[in-house]
């Protein structure tokens, strides 16, 4: 469904990604783990077209994405939940969700809204509340709900557990698993390696802009090198 083939990305003269190859198959949850500054978010941003890959290929459902503007890429049934949530703080929950569904067909809009509110009952309770007055966990639910309003086939999640309480993190990961059961393919970028690897079908480890390991989530969870580096031994 999605493949990166020897992708390299630069910020000016600084190379952030070095010949990165990653594959996400339809119906999978694939996670990318790594330390701060490893290049995880850069890989997602490169997929979205900003920055553009300097070399290599990124294909989604057989179509080459490198060279396309971000506005075109994001109309291809791909949705992103950015790091830090980035909800529209002065808009209500309803208005935030409406922004996510801006390009959704009129016939599908209310169906999708109902699905999101069923998935996140808390958003239904806070429907008329301004997003900026909500807790971090509620804002993360809203950010995911907003992304789902576009009816994506592929959902990109950038550090969804960042800054959240453990009980909320567990809820978020349960929702990600539920989305997979409903047919959404998930590419998860996450520092919380323990949770991410438990959830993932397959996983990649990124260090200094390079893929250094790739295996099933279960295998990496028990890998001594991964445990020492990312799971506290």
Curated annotation (Swiss-Prot):
Broad class of the protein's primary localization: membrane
Keywords of the record: Amino-acid transport, ATP-binding, Cell inner membrane, Cell membrane, Membrane, Nucleotide-binding, Transport
Matches recorded under Pfam families: ABC_tran (PF00005)
GO molecular function: ATP binding; ATP hydrolysis activity; branched-chain amino acid transmembrane transporter activity
Location(s) in or outside the cell: Cell inner membrane
Residues reported in the UniProt entry to bind ATP: 34-41
GO CC entries: plasma membrane
One GO BP annotation of this record: L-amino acid transport
Bilayer topology annotation: Peripheral membrane protein
Domain ABC transporter residues, every copy: 2-233
PANTHER family in the cross-refs: HIGH-AFFINITY BRANCHED-CHAIN AMINO ACID TRANSPORT ATP-BINDING PROTEIN LIVF
Family affiliation: Belongs to the ABC transporter superfamily.
Task performed by this protein: Component of the high affinity leucine, isoleucine, valine, transport system (LIV-I), which is operative without Na(+) and is specific for alanine and threonine, in addition to branched-chain amino acids.
Protein name, per record: High-affinity branched-chain amino acid transport ATP-binding protein BraG
Gene name of the encoded protein: braG
